[in-house]
């Protein structure tokens, strides 16, 4: 038997219960893992509180990412005792996730934990950090180098944004960090490596088809008006990695930046990212993230506190990462 947080649907309402489950109750999969850490993401908050239509299977153990040790495996890539990390693939939505002492998943969904990272550090990175690394890889593959010019990161105080700032700065890029709370978040972003802070209000003005060229590249987590504005401000040959829609899913832009300035807009998805790409990204995270990244605000909680933390994250009351220690 092992401890787990189980979500059930009772008369249309999501009811979370701390319970004990038997191994036989775990869903099908090739690899059974002893979970060491999970984390609370915004999507987890929506699932656990029932505020968003996230859960696709009842009952469900939530938790969209986790790290731990293989207990048994029918996949030749993994042996008992191996350290692994999981993000994405609909885990914690349509397949039982990381908010339990054990999980059983497909081998294809796991990635071996790279040398230099432990389970706690892996969850400090989590889904957000993997997405950030995939964005950085996209910019590198578009030919953007530290000599290309300034790189803008939007939503810089969020999980993806903050990790993007840290990675780019560690790789030698000049980073401008866009945030809606410059006074509150400026010091943290500077500590992560941002060379300057840009108030979000500067990019909320409606964009002309083309504007003054300001950015060599950008990582955008916001979408909508902000993405349209920065596209109009990209340098000739610039590249934007777009991975979020915190500001909306619309894009009020024109073809002008693409056909007159040779700008590249690259979409980045981490949920269905193939195994080889994930493995590369995790290896790069282990190599490129500075030690100082793991010293930022991190709160550790137990399963007993997850429901309270889920409510808090949906109300914007959580700063930094919240890890769940199993």
Please report, for each region that a protein language model flagged, where it lies by residue:
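Glycine-rich beta-strand-centered segment in the early N-terminal region that forms part
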Residues: 24-40, 51-91
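Residue-level marker of beta-strand positions
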Residues: 65, 82-83, 102, 150, ...
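Short, glycine/polar-rich helix-capping loops at beta-to-alpha or helix-loop-helix junctions
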Residues: 99, 180-188, 249-255
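Glycine-rich phosphate-binding loop and adjacent beta-alpha segment
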Residues: 225-291
């Amino acid at each position: 038997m092992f401890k787990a947080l189980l979500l059930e649907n009772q008369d249309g309402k999501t009811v979370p219960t701390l319970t004990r489950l038997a191994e036989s109750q775990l869903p099908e999969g090739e690899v059974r893992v002893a979970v060491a850490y999970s984390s609370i993401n915004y999507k987890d908050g929506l699932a656990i509180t029932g505020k968003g239509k996230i859960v696709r299977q009842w009952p469900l153990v939530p938790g969209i990412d986790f790290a731990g040790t293989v207990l048994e495996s029918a996949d030749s890539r993994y042996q008992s005792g191996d350290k692994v990390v999981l993000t994405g693939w609909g885990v914690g939505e349509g397949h039982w996730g990381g908010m339990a002492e054990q999980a059983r998943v497909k081998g294809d969904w796991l990635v071996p934990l790279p040398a230099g990272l432990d389970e706690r550090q892996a969850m400090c990175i989590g889904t957000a950090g993997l997405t950030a690394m995939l964005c950085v890889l996209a910019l590198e593959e578009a030919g953007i180098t530290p000599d290309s010019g300034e790189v803008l990161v939007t939503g810089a105080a969020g999980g993806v944004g903050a990790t993007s700032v840290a990675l780019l700065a560690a790789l030698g890029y000049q980073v401008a960090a866009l945030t809606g709370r410059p006074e509150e978040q400026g010091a943290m972003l500077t500590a992560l490596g941002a060379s300057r802070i840009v108030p979000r209000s500067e990019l909320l003005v409606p964009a002309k088809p083309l504007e003054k060229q300001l950015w060599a590249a950008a990582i955008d987590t916001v979408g909508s008006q902000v993405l349209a504005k920065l596209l109009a401000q990209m340098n000739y040959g610039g590249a934007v990695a777009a991975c979020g829609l915190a500001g909306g899913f619309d894009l009020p832009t024109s073809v002008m930046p693409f056909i007159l300035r040779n700008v590249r807009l690259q979409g980045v998805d981490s949920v269905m990212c193939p195994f080889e790409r994930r493995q590369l990204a995790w290896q790069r995270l282990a190599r490129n993230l500075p030690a100082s990244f793991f010293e930022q605000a991190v709160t550790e909680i137990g399963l007993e506190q997850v429901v309270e933390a889920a409510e808090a994250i949906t109300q914007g009351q959580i700063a930094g990462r919240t890890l769940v220690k199993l």
